[in-house]
Amino acid sequence: MNEKSYQSNPDDRSDNVEKLQDMIENTLDNIDESEAAMALSTDQEKQMIKQKNENRKMSIDAMRSEIKDEEAARKNGYTE
């Protein structure tokens, strides 16, 4: 039998803050676009959009918290 040995990738956190910031910006753009789409939506679709946007806002809060954690890790030299 062939046994393959897989090596895990090293933990590269060097650009996590930037990636999270991009994700926040993209999520904010999605909120703006979905709110614009509400003008052409049915009541049911509007309700779904509102719920999605609430979920997006919660995700943004979590990402901002993660940014704080990552910035603290940078200051501490990424020690775990």
Swiss-Prot record:
Induction: Expressed only in the forespore compartment of sporulating cells. Its main location: other. It is found in: Spore core. It comes from the Bacteria. InterPro entries: SASP_thioredoxin-like. GO terms for biological process: asexual sporulation; sporulation resulting in formation of a cellular spore. This is Small, acid-soluble spore protein Tlp.
